[in-house]
């Protein structure tokens, strides 16, 4: 009978046991260089063996039974959590292997069940360790890859959204390292847009806190953060699932004032993204009195400003149609008393 675990002749249980032991050696502060080197080699070797079980090799497809055994061993031993907790102790290639192993095991399905998702729901610390990974440059991008894979699964996205740690994203997207800040923003955006109903529920329940933090991003000194945040705000407000949130946001005069200021930003791209949020205020047929007052007070200035606004975008038909529509809407604005007369 052929051995089911390929040429390494190591069972999933052996691989997990060896890897756990090698990780325990690396965790010790006072080990000799020789021992550390040996443990690092063992970790690399066992991670590769684990990948072969999950992904197969050129000669051999993955074996369902071996994959199931490996998954079970990872849960029972707590190794999945250890690999995330000790990611910075693993070498460069090994970190990439961990992310591939983690994401593969996370996607694993048995019928309609996703056992690793169920497991992480009971071991939520794994999610928060991944999130905290953004604070360590050497593991930030690996953690981002695993975190976004987690967010594909609604139960895991919900745990993060409803956690106190979610608000750490407002720090991470402002980080000075461009790659890390961009990666954090991609994860942040995923959380707010992937599961529409879940995101709408979250934004409705946490509106005040979320938008008071979000406004700081719109004032960011960092051009990329400011532009991405403005673009995402436009997407969130125009998504039909977020109708309640949009209605609330566009009823507040301070939000309109901010967009009018951003329309005059020194960056053309920021102006353009601000336009897409500003248009929602103007197009709203049920404007609140404070919004109407601001638009009427600035009516002539706005008409003149919009008539000349980015006129060189001649190819962008939709933008020009929207601009024409807004100018007409602002020109037709009247005070309610005048309308009744």
Swiss-Prot record:
GO terms for molecular function: kinase binding; protein kinase activator activity; protein serine/threonine kinase activator activity; protein serine/threonine kinase binding. The keyword Ribosomal protein does not apply. GO terms for cellular component: cytoplasm; cytosol; extracellular exosome; extracellular region; ficolin-1-rich granule lumen; secretory granule lumen; serine/threonine protein kinase complex; Z disc. Component of a trimeric complex composed of STK11/LKB1, STRAD (STRADA or STRADB) and CAB39/MO25 (CAB39/MO25alpha or CAB39L/MO25beta): the complex tethers STK11/LKB1 in the cytoplasm and stimulates its catalytic activity. It is found in: Cytoplasm. Its main location: cytoplasm. The keyword Cytoplasm applies. Component of a complex that binds and activates STK11/LKB1. In the complex, required to stabilize the interaction between CAB39/MO25 (CAB39/MO25alpha or CAB39L/MO25beta) and STK11/LKB1. Belongs to the Mo25 family. This is Calcium-binding protein 39. One of its GO terms (biological process) is intracellular signal transduction. Changing residue 243 to A: Abolishes activation of STK11/LKB1. It comes from Homo sapiens. It comes from the Eukaryota. InterPro entries: ARM-like (IPR011989), ARM-type_fold (IPR016024), Mo25 (IPR013878). Keywords: Cytoplasm.
């Amino acid at each position: 009978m052929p051995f089911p675990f390929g040429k390494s002749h190591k069972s999933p249980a052996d691989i997990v046991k060896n890897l756990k032991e090698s990780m325990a050696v690396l965790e010790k502060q006072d080990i000799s260089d020789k021992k550390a080197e040996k443990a690092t080699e063992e970790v690399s070797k066992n991670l590769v063996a684990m990948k072969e079980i999950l992904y197969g090799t050129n000669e051999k497809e993955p074996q369902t039974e071996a994959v199931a055994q490996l998954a079970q061993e990872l849960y029972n031993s707590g190794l999945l959590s250890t690999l995330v907790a000790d990611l910075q102790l693993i070498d460069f290639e090994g970190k990439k292997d961990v992310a591939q192993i983690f994401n593969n095991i996370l996607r694993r399905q048995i019928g309609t069940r996703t056992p690793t998702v169920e497991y992480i729901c009971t071991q939520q610390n794994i999610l928060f360790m991944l999130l905290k990974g953004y604070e360590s440059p050497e593991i930030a991008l690996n953690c981002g890859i695993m975190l976004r894979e987690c967010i594909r699964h609604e139960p895991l996205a919900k745990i993060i959204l409803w956690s106190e740690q979610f608000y750490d994203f407002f720090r991470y997207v402002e980080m000075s390292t461009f790659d890390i800040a961009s990666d954090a923003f991609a994860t942040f955006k995923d959380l707010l847009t992937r599961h529409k109903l879940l995101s709408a529920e979250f934004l409705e329940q946490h509106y005040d806190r979320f938008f008071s933090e979000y406004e700081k991003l719109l004032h960011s000194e960092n051009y990329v953060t400011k532009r991405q945040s403005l673009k995402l705000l436009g997407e969130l407000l125009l998504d039909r699932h977020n109708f309640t949130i949009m209605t609330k946001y566009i009823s507040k005069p301070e939000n309109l004032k901010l967009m009018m200021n951003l329309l005059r930003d020194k960056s053309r791209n920021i102006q353009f993204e601000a336009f897409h949020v500003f248009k929602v205020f103007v197009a709203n047929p049920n404007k609140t009195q404070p919004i109407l007052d601001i638009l009427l007070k600035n009516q002539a200035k706005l008409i003149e400003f919009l008539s000349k606004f980015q006129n060189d975008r001649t190819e962008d038909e939709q933008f020009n149609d929207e601009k024409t529509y807004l100018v007409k809407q602002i020109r037709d604005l009247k005070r309610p008393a005048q309308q009744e007369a």
